[in-house]
Amino acid sequence: MKTHKSLSTLLVVAFALAPQLLNTSPRALAASGGTYSARLISPTIGQVLHPGQQVRIQWKDSLPNVRYVAWCEMEVWLSLDGGRTFTMCITPILAPKTTYFDWTVPNAPTNAAVLDVRFGCDGWYPESYSPQAASTFVIAQN
């Protein structure tokens, strides 16, 4: 019976300390090794893409210093409304050091396509967004 009480006490203490161990505030992230950012290289601002076209999406990023990089991932999302909403994930889950993805342009005409290059690590770094609104491009009608 004493073992059961000791185990219960240990679990209560562990759960009480858990939020402190997973502090993901901007200040804590900066102190632990920086924040995430990305800059789109291609497609470029104003570039006209056509449905079915193969395009290399390429970016340069600054990754935070994360303890367990194997638990991290990247994704690229597409907005068709100038970056107000990102409803289409256009990549599979990518390794964190990936800097490009070969993409087949969908038949989704818009004059305001924007990409968001995302990064995150389960339990170690929150999903972080880097929408590329300064690099709006066009998906032409088929």
Predicted feature descriptions by range:
Residues 2-11:
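Bacterial N-terminal signal peptides that target proteins for export
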